[in-house]
């Protein structure tokens, strides 16, 4: 069968081998190929930037740093489906590469004769050029696997760095590493062993970027607090905000105050409800709906406008009534959806969304009641004595980390069934949208400690690492793997990849990953991860309960 594209970066990739005609996500082949060209341009920019850094050239690297992070983010699964949007990024990166190339030459820097550095193209040439720079350009399956594992980790890292940057928090060391890693996977000079080391180094920088974003979020909006979140609806029109960007959340709440419009979170924006600064807004009503993949039904019943601040977008059905009510911003895009730009100061005008909301009916109720969350590291460590006492007394036998992503595959019912089957002396630690598989179950509590502790968004997996390291210290253990903590993680896209690599870099072993192992892991690379880190897939609920809760 003719390959019109090749992409295997997400968990739902066709046959767990790769999408070759159209993305399972809904991305058409021309857009997928254009993303390959965009990443190829970023590799060229990174090679030039790394060469200039090594030469000690004093320059304003900010423009290139932002271009790399923002464009990597735009290629994450379900972020951007808009060919024209990606084409604009390709055009800008060609221009930036030419600018940096000239600067390097004027500084007397000898640049490598690598096609990623030298390639230039006009818009009418993009489709042709894109066909020559895809993933399969690397013919060695194991080398390709290690390179793509690094790149997918970098995509997740870039997403978190971009969020922190929006709040004014930047780490130059993270930017320089990202460029060096792109340089290293492109130049073809590293052995398989060196590429494996680069994968783990990417994980260690994943820890750094999650720490940076945690600092940005908590210093800006306060430490998340234990919060009961309303999942019902009010009587006023609403705006639904989805994604991860808390800066957009802040601006939307500011601009909707006093307008008679309520604001609801959806999907990964749910944890915004836990931040103290947002609680002062009386029109911040609560959360509507569930994980990203249910949006086709939930956007219909919400009745009002929807704002995507990041992934995950699901292409709407042709007859969807909500298509004209969806807005995108930042790295996101979809043909026909309106895009909200920011000004030179990063501010956005949401007046069009607000005006539309005023013409809409209030949301239709799909559920009622409350759910509880806000168990990030500051909150949990404030009750560390209580937690340690519960472990010491045997009241809590095991903590089960079930962070990660949700998805459409029917096999993901496993995670609901697994949560229900866990013994009553276990506590689930979660973050990311995987929580929607079990955060509305009535699992009770242990001595006042809820049996599902939601730390927040996928990046708040950092909180779970902080909690684990603190418990290791308090309990006087010399190895994080001696803690009564086991890992059964659901993955979907590239932010889950950087979380996994971060855990590996911290020395965590015996992580179960599902519902399938990534297609981009070649048999030999998978073998290395299994032998050195105890990485495993999932089995049946009964088998995994026996294995993990011994």
UniProtKB/Swiss-Prot annotation:
Subcellular location: Cytoplasm
Keywords: 4Fe-4S, Cytoplasm, Iron, Iron-sulfur, Metal-binding, Oxidoreductase
Manner of cofactor binding, per the entry note: Binds 1 [4Fe-4S] cluster.
Cofactor(s) the protein requires to work: [4Fe-4S] cluster; hybrid [4Fe-2O-2S] cluster
Domain of life: Bacteria
Catalytic activity: A + NH4(+) + H2O = hydroxylamine + AH2 + H(+)
Family statement: Belongs to the HCP family.
UniProt protein name: Hydroxylamine reductase
Source species: Porphyromonas gingivalis (strain ATCC 33277 / DSM 20709 / CIP 103683 / JCM 12257 / NCTC 11834 / 2561)
Organism classification: Bacteria, Pseudomonadati, Bacteroidota, Bacteroidia, Bacteroidales
